């Protein structure tokens, strides 16, 4: 489901593109913002109104390459953060949380630090083939990865690697139950009686990969590429302006369009300014 809001936020830009006052702005409904700028109406994002897209079902995991000299430090950090080592070989480590995803972070061992891209799970083998053709890239079998599957890696217009996976088997059930939900008292309802809220110190409870962000140069180019080729649509768009008639889109929160199925507010964040 889609929640369309556009947020205006002004910034100082030192690149020479535009110069606006910092620390001012407002949040307005998308349809209000669209009256004065060249945005298409919300119906433009309905999956049925566009040509067939590569159908993404969820965000799967992140992929990075790390030098061997830094692997022990990385492992210590991720274990302290709340992940666990699912599998380790001479060339890679797979780190996971407690959810049904086999792993959420892939660390390949190489000569240098390198971003290998976020990974999206696609709906069908045909979608994987279409992604492969889009990037003219091969489909490889993940023989060593927990859960297996097949993957292809393409690159977006700014050169970021983008991975697509199909056929990976999830865990049959989470490794443990989620944390007990906090009971909150309000003015009229007092479900928590005679009990304190106490938190146990320790690592975070890592469930899944929720989202990742990219800091980019050409927002319009990247935005069109991701929304034209895949079922990614904006939940929120942020823009800056130096006068009422000149507005520049600078960031977007994108979610996966699954029709009437409710999904997370965003799984990808792209900005041409400071990355969150």
Predicted regions located by residue number:
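Core segments of cupin and vicinal oxygen chelate
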Residues: 2, 13-25, 57-102, 214-263
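Vicinal oxygen chelate
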Residues: 2-51, 65-72, 136-205, 252-253, ...
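The feature marks the first
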Residues: 36-37, 42-141, 148
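Structured loop/turn residues at beta-strand edges in well-structured enzyme cores
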Residues: 57, 113, 157, 207, ...
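Conserved beta-strand positions that form and line the central face of beta-propeller blades
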Residues: 94, 106, 153, 253, ...
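Short, well-ordered strand-loop elements centered on a beta-strand within folded domains, enriched
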Residues: 113-117, 267, 271-276
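Amide-forming acyltransferase catalytic core, primarily the GNAT-like/NAT-type
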Residues: 146, 160, 165-273
